[in-house]
Swiss-Prot record:
One example GO MF annotation: quinone binding
UniProt similarity note: Belongs to the PqqD family.
Quaternary structure and partners: Monomer. Interacts with PqqE.
Alphabetical GO biological process terms: pyrroloquinoline quinone biosynthetic process
Associated pathway: Cofactor biosynthesis; pyrroloquinoline quinone biosynthesis
InterPro entries, A to Z: PQQD, PqqD_bac, PqqD_sf
Annotated source species: Pseudomonas putida (strain W619)
Key words, A-Z: PQQ biosynthesis
Keyword Membrane: no
Source lineage: Bacteria, Pseudomonadati, Pseudomonadota, Gammaproteobacteria, Pseudomonadales
Name listed for the protein in its UniProt record: PqqA binding protein
Family annotation (Pfam families): PqqD
Gene: pqqD
């Protein structure tokens, strides 16, 4: 089954994506704690706004990083993990 790139990701209520100077990186805050995101996840997370679909996020990052193979696959994998961990909804 293929991933539907027309879905629009949004952070779940209670989850907040932000830059945390003490962590020297982006984090995802939620009521039970915090997750420090790696650079790739931070770039993707910064584009999750509840308006852009996954295709738009892929297009944006492919333009920022031309010639980087598998950008789309990496974004799909992030979306699957984030949904599985209940960080985001996909509608």
């Amino acid at each position: 089954m293929s991933f539907d790139r027309k879905q629009v990701p949004n952070w779940r209520p209670g989850y907040r994506f932000q830059y945390e100077p003490a962590q020297k990186g982006h984090v995802l805050l939620y009521p039970e704690g915090m997750i420090k995101l790696n650079d790739s996840a931070s770039l993707i997370g910064g584009l999750i706004d509840g308006k852009r679909d996954v295709n738009a996020i892929i297009t944006e990052l492919e333009q920022q990083f031309p010639g980087v193979p598998e950008v789309a696959d990496d974004i799909e994998q992030f979306m699957e993990v984030a949904r599985g961990e209940h960080w985001i909804t996909l509608a």
